[in-house]
């Protein structure tokens, strides 16, 4: 049996109620972490807490809107107060803010500001709070930022979103250099289109079929695919990895016949 070095460590997962975040919380618990689960969906948090406890680990549930000033700091402080420390932070924040993909000429200033705020600015706020706690504690740790495959290539309909996620990649690299001397690793994962409940509801069957046909491995991510990758990077298996963006898209970045967005 491989020792991942995660037993007894404490992880904080934001955006933890559905999809990738929920899978990450569950898999970190399976790997031995106690987990603080954070999401603004107050009704959904208890279910993820039960997921963690079902794996025999301690859990803290916190309903919080990280867009509010000071909330990221409060969430980190609550995690340490309840679970004793912080070792791993997974920043699964950000989305299209309910706005959906759109041609760039239809992305007005309000659209761009909202998408950048919910992706780059939220991630930066979380990183700042987590890094401060890890450096102060002096025992090192790992910060994992959830980026996107759309940050690595032109993404029709996702100009603001892709740019915000690309900025997260740069933030990840810079923090890796700044925090490395304190023993803190910072990495990012870039999922391709992942079959979360939100994505399943948003995409037509015809579009999904066309997208799968364009992907070299002929499949799309499930949330568990990303969760296993996060666990590997957060564990001692990934102890030499920092400042890296790790793609998990089944080869979609190599596709030349990717279907156009359905709005087009």
Language-model segments: what does each one mean?
Residues 127, 164, 172:
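Active-site helix of classical SDR
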Residues 1-3, 101, 242-264:
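Short C-terminal tail/terminal secondary-structure segment
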């Amino acid at each position: 049996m491989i020792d991942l070095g995660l037993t007894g460590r404490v992880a904080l997962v934001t955006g933890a109620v559905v999809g990738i975040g929920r899978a990450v919380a569950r898999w970190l618990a399976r790997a031995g972490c106690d987990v603080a689960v954070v999401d603004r969906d107050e009704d959904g948090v208890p279910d993820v807490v039960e997921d963690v406890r079902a794996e025999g680990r301690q859990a803290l549930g916190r309903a919080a809107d990280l867009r509010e000033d000071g909330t990221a700091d409060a969430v980190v402080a609550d995690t340490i107060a309840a679970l004793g420390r912080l070792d791993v932070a997974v920043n699964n924040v950000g989305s299209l803010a309910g706005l959906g993909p759109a041609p760039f000429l239809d992305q007005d200033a309000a659209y761009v500001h909202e998408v950048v705020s919910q992706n780059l600015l939220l991630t930066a706020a979380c990183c700042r709070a987590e890094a401060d706690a890890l450096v102060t504690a002096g025992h090192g740790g790992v910060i994992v930022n959830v980026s996107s495959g759309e940050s690595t290539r032109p993404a029709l309909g996702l100009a603001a979103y892709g740019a915000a996620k690309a900025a997260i990649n740069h933030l990840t690299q810079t923090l890796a250099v700044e925090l490395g001397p304190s023993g803190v690793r910072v990495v990012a994962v870039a999922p391709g289109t992942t079959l979360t409940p939100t994505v399943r509801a948003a995409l037509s069957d015809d579009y999904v079929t066309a997208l799968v046909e364009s992907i070299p491995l002929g499949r799309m991510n499930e949330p568990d695919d990303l969760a296993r990758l996060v666990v590997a990077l957060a564990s001692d298996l990934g102890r030499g990895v920092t400042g890296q963006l790790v793609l998990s898209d089944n080869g979609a970045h190599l596709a030349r016949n990717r279907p156009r967005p359905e709005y087009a």
